[in-house]
């Protein structure tokens, strides 16, 4: 099955009199917010997140993660989950092509670490629950910490079995934990969780949701007390918990969560989930972005999540899991840190260069305070404009205004240009999804897609190829506001 476009609808907006649709995307009116990554942060926290792609928007441009699918057992049933479903092209949490033993996981981790110098994090995110299937989780992470000592370790959990393992996590030097928390009101929980398995018995209904809620809050508090960074994932389910997630954000902030990641429900009927089979709709992209903006000022909001598979490998948006199948793990391979050390030195230079260039580009702009552009960018990583439009598997969307710029989300797409030929239907789907944006910045784009985008009111440019993204969108913004001739830029 093809991954395809999301079911979430993105509608068009009318252009302003000046020809730049500067304030809306879909049904959503944008605020003038900048990046949600805090400017002032304790040095110890910066050190913890600087190379963790899931906890830092900047880090995800440079560093890769690896999920090891060893935890197959789970202790709750979610209405949005069916772990039995798998497709090589399907990208969503809980999906894995193969379950690994702890020994296979170690060999895969070493193979990936030797071939992917960007690797900085090894985690267990399913396909079941890392804390409930604790024996396998522990048997996997301990040897990895011994054999690959320069990677960070993390886990993802529903939180039900988390409290009894927090001290073990500290002893194993696991510094990052993600908890999926979809409610703090058990009445809402009954619409999401049919049952849980806790303390040797199965619970249903309000009792199940109450126990889960209490255990999640306890686990989060324990992580905070012990200095483990906690990220909270929440699935936005329209009509079920979408408004309630504002309350969830307040609760997790009070208990020390570092980051809150609100993800859209994925409810394709073919996945066989309760929600999918009952036609529960997923949120429109405009609804998701609007909710994330309403959460600003609470726990830091994550906007670069890719809803990764339980066996994901590589940079976010550039999965390489299929390069490392079971038969490709040499039994006697040992870890060699040379490539990774060289890469880290390169990235330090890149980051210093990016900081200097962005500082030079940050010239104050004289413009109306409500003037805002929506800019799409294709990138292969490194924080640069370096992605060919026809080969892109995702498009990042930025808002930019006089006060600054910020990543507001991304669109997952199928590349329309394969083997030198373009798939017309795929291209049309992508163009429909980009309606309402102002400019597309990419490294290259063909004449036909460029003209089609222009007819939809989206200008495309390859003039900033190789530039840092922040620098490129800032320069483009100034050119537009000053009514400069855009022939050289567009």
Swiss-Prot record:
| GO annotation, biological process | nitrogen fixation
Domain Radical SAM core: from-to ranges: 60-309
Report residues binding [4Fe-4S] cluster 2: 305, 308
Q: What class of enzyme is it?
A: lyase
Q: Write out the residues that bind [4Fe-4S] cluster 1.
A: 74, 78, 81
Pathway involvement of the protein, from the record: Cofactor biosynthesis; Fe-Mo cofactor biosynthesis
Recorded hits in PROSITE patterns, A to Z, give: MOAA_NIFB_PQQE, RADICAL_SAM
- What's noted on cofactor binding? Binds 3 [4Fe-4S] clusters per monomer. One cluster is coordinated with 3 cysteines and an exchangeable S-adenosyl-L-methionine. The two others probably act as substrate.
Q: Which cofactor does it need?
A: [4Fe-4S] cluster
- Name the keywords, alphabetized: 4Fe-4S, Iron, Iron-sulfur, Lyase, Metal-binding, Nitrogen fixation, Plasmid, S-adenosyl-L-methionine
In short, the EC number is 4.-.-.-
In terms of InterPro entries, this protein maps to: Aldolase_TIM (IPR013785), Di-Nase_FeMo-co_biosynth (IPR003731), DiNase_FeMo-co_biosyn_sf (IPR036105), MoaA_NifB_PqqE_Fe-S-bd_CS (IPR000385), Nase_CF_NifB (IPR005980), NifB_C (IPR034165), rSAM (IPR007197)
Q: Name one GO molecular function term.
A: lyase activity
Q: Record-annotated residues binding S-adenosyl-L-methionine?
A: 80, 128, 180
Q: Which Pfam families match?
A: Nitro_FeMo-Co, Radical_SAM
Q: What family is this protein classified in?
A: Belongs to the radical SAM superfamily. NifB family.
Protein's job = Involved in the biosynthesis of the iron-molybdenum cofactor (FeMo-co or M-cluster) found in the dinitrogenase enzyme of the nitrogenase complex in nitrogen-fixing microorganisms. NifB catalyzes the crucial step of radical SAM-dependent carbide insertion that occurs concomitant with the insertion of a 9th sulfur and the rearrangement/coupling of two [4Fe-4S] clusters into a [8Fe-9S-C] cluster, the precursor to the M-cluster.
Protein name per the record? FeMo cofactor biosynthesis protein NifB
Gene this protein is translated from: nifB
